[in-house]
């Protein structure tokens, strides 16, 4: 089964990412909740890269590679856009966002809650986000 995909940085390609992750995960007997959480986390990172790092520039690309390491799945999403500076990130109060009806700004916080480990790296001009999830 193919375990990598490359898409142009257009929001219309987010469905392609979600479908690809769902198809890949279908080989494993995951609960529907876990499957949907993983798809949500990968979709959120891909959306952030498309919108914020690459300014929805369809001439730019991001790549997703999925691999299994023992009991853990690794989702590696890479691009050549503006790198995410985790040191500048302040986790929002999700309950407060809900209470006041604020939209947006909680994606990374949700990803942090869903995945076991989240890493942001830069190697040369390539930015990499690694999402780890133990499911086996």
Write out the residue ranges for each language-model feature.
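Flexible, glycine-/charge-rich segments associated with ATP-binding catalytic modules
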Residues: 1-5, 112-136
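Helix-loop-beta hinge of the Bergerat
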Residues: 2-32
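Conserved short strand/loop->alpha-helix "switch" segment adjacent to the catalytic nucleotide/phosphoryl-transfer site
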Residues: 21-43, 100-102
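Conserved polar catalytic motif of the HATPase_c/GHKL fold
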Residues: 44, 48, 113
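Short helix-loop "hinge" at the ATP-lid/N-box region of the Bergerat-fold HATPase_c
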Residues: 49-54
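Short beta-strand/loop element within the Bergerat-fold HATPase_c
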Residues: 61-71
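Glycine-rich/acidic phosphate-handling loop/turn and adjacent ATP-lid/helix
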Residues: 75-103
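Glycine-rich phosphate-binding loop
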Residues: 100-115
């Amino acid at each position: 089964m193919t375990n990598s995909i490359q898409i142009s940085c257009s929001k219309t390609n987010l469905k392609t990412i979600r479908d690809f992750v769902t198809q890949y995960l279908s080989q494993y007997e995951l609960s529907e909740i876990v499957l949907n959480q993983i798809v949500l986390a990968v979709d959120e990172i891909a959306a952030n890269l498309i919108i914020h790092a690459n300014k929805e520039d369809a001439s730019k690309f991001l790549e997703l590679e999925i691999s299994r390491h023992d009991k853990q799945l690794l989702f590696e999403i890479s691009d050549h856009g503006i790198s995410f500076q985790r040191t500048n990130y302040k986790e929002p109060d999700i309950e407060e966002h809900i209470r006041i009806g604020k939209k947006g700004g909680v994606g990374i916080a949700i990803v942090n809650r869903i995945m076991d480990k989240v890493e942001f790296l830069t190697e040369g001009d390539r930015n990499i986000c690694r999402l780890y999830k133990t499911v086996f």
